[in-house]
Regions:
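Alpha-helical tetratricopeptide repeat
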Residues: 1-90
Length: 90
């Protein structure tokens, strides 16, 4: 609820969407989590952690190509461990 309140009050605050997505992953609501990661990325195109986590979530739900695309973007933005994960799924 707190994240929803923050998102309502500050709709451009990327970290609120990112944190809500992380919480949804813990609750195993992966499709909703992807939606919130996507909103975080739309608010901040350079949000490497959001690309990374969305990529992992895509891979978890077996959307490997989308996951690899996001992990690649996360790597470009400085999360170099993403490249190691990509090599496992190609």
């Amino acid at each position: 609820r707190d994240y929803d309140y923050v998102i309502h009050k500050l709709p451009d605050f990327s970290f609120a969407y990112y944190n809500k997505a992380n919480m949804l992953c813990i609750q195993q609501d992966f499709k909703a989590a992807i939606s919130y990661y996507t909103q975080a990325i739309q608010n901040d195109n350079d949000f490497a952690e959001a690309y990374f986590n969305r990529g992992l979530t895509y891979i978890y739900i077996n959307e490997i190509d989308k996951g690899i695309t996001d992990l690649s973007k996360a790597g470009e933005l400085g999360i170099y461990q993403a490249y190691n994960l990509i090599s496992r799924f190609q």
